[in-house]
Amino acid sequence: MSAYLTPGQIKSALANTPQITFEVTDACNLRCEYCAYGKLYSDYDKREDRMLPTETAKRFIDYMAALWASPDNHSVNNNLYVGFYGGEPLLNTPFIKEIVGYLKAGGHAKRFAYNMTTNAMLLDRHMDFLVEHNFSLLISLDGNTENDSYRIKADGKPSFEQVVKNVDMLHAAYPEYFAKKVNFNAVLHNRNSVDGIRGFIKERYGKTPRIGDINDSGIREDMKEEFKRMYRNSYESLLQNENYDEIEKEMFLSSPTYHSATIFLMQNSPFKYENYNELLFGKNENKTFCPTGTCIPFSRKVFVTVNGKILPCERIGHQYSVGHVDANGVMLDFEAIADKYNTYYSCLEKKCRLCKNQRTCIQCMFYLNGLENGKCECNGFMDEKQFERYRQTQLAFFVRHPDAYSEIMKNVIYK
């Protein structure tokens, strides 16, 4: 079996990870019908209204602190983002307050910044604390009343009025904070559109929202028809608008077309450099090929679930945990993690070597069916004809937006 990743690479990635995210609770005060932890899906731990114990989180922070003090850490004094995730994280505000205090008192050689994704149902009660600690907030809102109608309370009633009331309150009380630190996230489905979401949030709050598709990984067999009924593709929704050029430019990287063109450019341009060493001394043409576009574990973040599972990301199924933290400490075996990843990569390499899109691939292998039994197939595979169509689509984008090349190359940091 080829050694695509080594234990040392993974340990170094964790020591220098730019973000730690805690699933502070699996409880939620909404029952969104497309929720990744809801009726459509099967790849998550059972939701039991649990709260992550502060001692568990502190134990993990102490483990990370030892790595920060080790030779593996080459990002001393860099920003480290600490995220609070749910469920609805504001249901466990005591945890958040205690962990923020613990980090501030720790004397670590890191600059901590805090972020949170929230449904805003409890924002009116806790906004002062969030503003005081300069939290970056990502508020979930799918547009107007009809657009937002899949986001319902436990009693089946709409959440829209209460959410908008609380967001309006934050906007009025802290306008400067709101302008700098608050953004919106929307999910596209059969009751809204890219233009409708953008129009509502732009008009009411002066913000351009991030818009994502409903998660298409881990769908239960008996819910596939329901998923298909609700699902809409953001790229297709964007192209259906008469003024889609204007929307594209305004959304920039939040636009699926800009995002796709950016990845294509960053992976193919001879003028893109990973660091100053590449710029000054040339690129390493002998870098190890890793199948798919899957991140090196912990290179972007580390995620701790409410049950103490450790994952490289909150977006993948909980069956792919790579470690655990509990009363006995942190259990992370870097050699075992490397072996697991290398086994997956070995399964995928033959197919990836034949794919003409391997240089620009962003396919996460954890979204592929059959990964665990060694029979995975990649939905993103491209033969020569498919890749040429993809290439022509990206080049046509730059013909349509001649200023986009300069904008992307000057303003985008791609990792």
Predicted regions and their residues:
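Conserved alpha-helical substructure of the radical SAM core
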Residues: 3-126
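Hydrophobic faces of well-ordered beta-strands that scaffold small-molecule active sites
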Residues: 20, 82, 114-116, 137-139, ...
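Cysteine-centered iron-sulfur cluster-binding motifs in ferredoxin-type domains/subunits
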Residues: 24-31, 298, 352-354, 358-359
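Conserved radical SAM core fold
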Residues: 41-42, 89-91, 120-124, 136-157, ...
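Glycine-enriched alpha-helix->loop->beta-strand junction motifs that scaffold or abut catalytic
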Residues: 131-137, 205-207
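Radical SAM enzyme [4Fe-4S]-AdoMet core and its adjacent flexible, acidic
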Residues: 150-164, 168-293, 297, 307
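Flexible mid-to-C-terminal extensions adjoining Fe-S/redox cofactors in radical SAM and related proteins
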Residues: 292, 309-310, 315-415
